[in-house]
């Protein structure tokens, strides 16, 4: 048996438009956000500038999480759910689409109960929140993506949720 010690020289690209992704685009800016403090600040800033739509996909979402924003100069609340609801109420053209995993009961002690119902009672009809429970047994909805006005995207491993807050310190 021969062991391979390096990748084959003929290896092609991993991502191929139309095959394993929709298309490829070039970003004019890119940054890595490691700490939740930086992510929440960038998320809040992007959302405050939103005019058309905000798409949020997450493994967990907790409307009670505080964004811990340094700039408390605007009139928007610091609590995540209230912040998003206020944005939608303030901007008549803005729509929010939020999809979160309908979690396993193992996580019930650390999750907010009935988040979709609570937000529906507060939010205008342009705020759409759904829980994803359609997946194989033992699986979960694990994407963590935010897209604002098709201009700014956050893709990675941080949920807009409790238990995620950290700083470089």
Residue ranges and their predicted role:
Residues 1-9:
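A short, flexible N-terminal coil/short beta segment enriched in small residues
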């Amino acid at each position: 048996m021969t062991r391979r010690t390096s990748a084959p020289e003929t290896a092609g690209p991993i991502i191929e438009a139309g095959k394993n992704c929709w298309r490829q685009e070039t970003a004019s800016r890119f940054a890595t956000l490691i700490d939740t403090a930086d992510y929440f600040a960038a998320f809040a800033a992007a959302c405050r500038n939103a005019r058309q739509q905000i798409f949020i996909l997450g493994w967990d979402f907790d409307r009670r999480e505080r964004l811990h924003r340094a700039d408390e100069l605007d009139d928007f609340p610091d609590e995540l759910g209230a912040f998003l609801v206020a944005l939608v109420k303030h901007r008549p053209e803005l729509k929010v689409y939020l999809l979160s995993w309908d979690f396993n009961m193992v996580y019930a002690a650390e999750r907010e109960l009935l988040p979709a119902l609570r937000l529906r009672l507060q939010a205008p009809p342009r705020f759409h929140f759904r829980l994803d429970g359609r997946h194989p047994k033992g699986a979960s909805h694990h994407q963590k993506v935010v897209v604002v006005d098709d201009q700014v995207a956050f893709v990675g491993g941080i949920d807009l949720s409790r238990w995620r807050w950290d700083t470089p310190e």
